[in-house]
Amino acid sequence: MIRLSLYIYRNPILHFVSSPISTSLSLLTLSLQFEVQMSFAKKEYEFLKEIGLGPHNLGCYASGVWRGNGPVITSINPSNNQVWLICLSDCKISFLKFEFDCCKFAIAEVTEASTEDYEEGMKACFEAAKTWMQIPAPKRGEIVRQIGDALRAKLQQLGRLVSLEMGKILAEGIGEVQEIIDMCDFAVGLSRQLNGSIIPSERPNHMMLEMWNPLGIVGVITAFNFPCAVLGWNACLALVCGDCVVWKGAPTTPLITIAMTKIVAGVLEKNNLPGAIFTSFCGGAEIGQAIAKDTRIPLVSFTGSSKVGLMVQKTVNERFGKCLLELSGNNAIIVMDDADIQLAARSVLFAAVGTAGQRCTTCRRLLLHESIYQRVLDQLLEVYKQVKIGDPLLSGTLLGPLHTRAARENFEKGIEIIKSQALAVSKNGGKILTGGSAIESEGNFVQPTIVEISPNADVVKEELFAPVLYVMKFQTLKEAIEINNSVPQGLSSSMFTHKPEVIFKWIG
């Protein structure tokens, strides 16, 4: 039960016109104020308190202070897409109080950063950089070590949050947080190896010294699919190198951004260091554009789509800044005629279905030698039947939801394109062998899909960010390599074979 207070206003926020109320209070204008400041609406969200989250959160950490003067957004669980919705059945009146059942609730609310918040944060970060770069690298490494330990202490809770808010299964959520911990360990070692060079000089009795100096501030813009691991890949190295970090997380995973920042902020505070060394913003394109344009940020790391990445690169280049870009992928697995078929089938399953096909390195194209084509395909179809789809927090689930309703709609559009090509009786048309439908539910669930298709089909050359696997034949290794390289995205590829000469030919 949720208790709501009843107030009387001239300009109401919300009117109730159900007959029991309007009959007895027909002369009054009613307004309700929802009181949920003290606890989460659902018990399964209560663990979020252990990592510093509440029903309402400020989404900007600037100058070592939490603030937020931008729009208020809602963090939604992709397994059920629940938003604030009150069930008015069995409504009871009790002396200016209402009690009724609430049937659907989002996870929490977040107040995003405004452009004013951004500017305040950047001013403080710019000043903090002067302090941080003067601290010896091994001591910076010690701070990163403490961050890693703080993450270890909250590994389970953070991993659970990743699964809850992003939608990947719990094992993947915990594994993602572990990646940051591992990067902290790596960066600690690196902090004692930032060596320069001694270079012989042409002048007698002279030598030249080369040493590394911090850039100052590194901007990190991360995507929803790996909402905290990508931060670790960038921030751990930036911090030990003496750079401050400005982080903008994905707008659809704000709670992860806040929880991670609270961990880092706690370590900085414990060591009496400026909180502005690590500045973070929850926000949308406006904040991302500000980072890309900001001349105080010499290096911007962006992870996301090729379309947006191109825009970021152009903006940063126009001010002669530097970019690190990790963009779209269209990854292939090549299975040669001598491969271990069972091993290949199991590996392809998780490569194509894991994270609901929303990894940058998801297997999207499966290239099978014609002599084993049907055998591998039969095994793959069999293991696809065993995929458990559902709540990513439940044991045994292998395929969670797509991250947003828009992603589910994009999956459906992609399937329609595949079907239309097949209906056109095109030599490049696709045939759906299994899956191919969204699952009727409140969540963003879709069926894992296998499509038999020509490598020349236009749809194969696009990145459909969903669990859709395109299967195609090849006759020779040369042909397989040509197919592998025939898409504009690339990013990663894999091979199954027992022959070293084939491996070396494949890797060039």
Residue ranges and their predicted role:
Residues I2-L4, N11-I21, L25-C87, I93-E109, ...:
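Terminal low-complexity tails and localization/encapsulation signals of metabolic enzymes
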Residues I21, F34-F40, D182-D185, G189-Q193, ...:
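C-terminal segments
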Residues Q33, S79-C87, F100-A108, N272, ...:
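Conserved C-terminal structural/oligomerization subdomain of aldehyde/semialdehyde dehydrogenase
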Residues N81, R140, V162, C184, ...:
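Residue-level signal for inorganic ion chemistry
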Residues Q82-L96, C103-L194, N205:
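Glycine-rich loop-to-alpha-helix module at the N-terminal edge of alpha/beta enzyme cores
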Residues A129, M133, G148-L155, G159, ...:
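Structural signal for hydrophobic packing residues in well-ordered secondary-structure cores
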Residues R152, G196-L343, F474:
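Rossmann-like NAD(P) dinucleotide-binding subdomain of oxidoreductase/dehydrogenase enzymes
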Residues G266, K307-P455, K473, L477-K478, ...:
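ALDH superfamily catalytic-core signature
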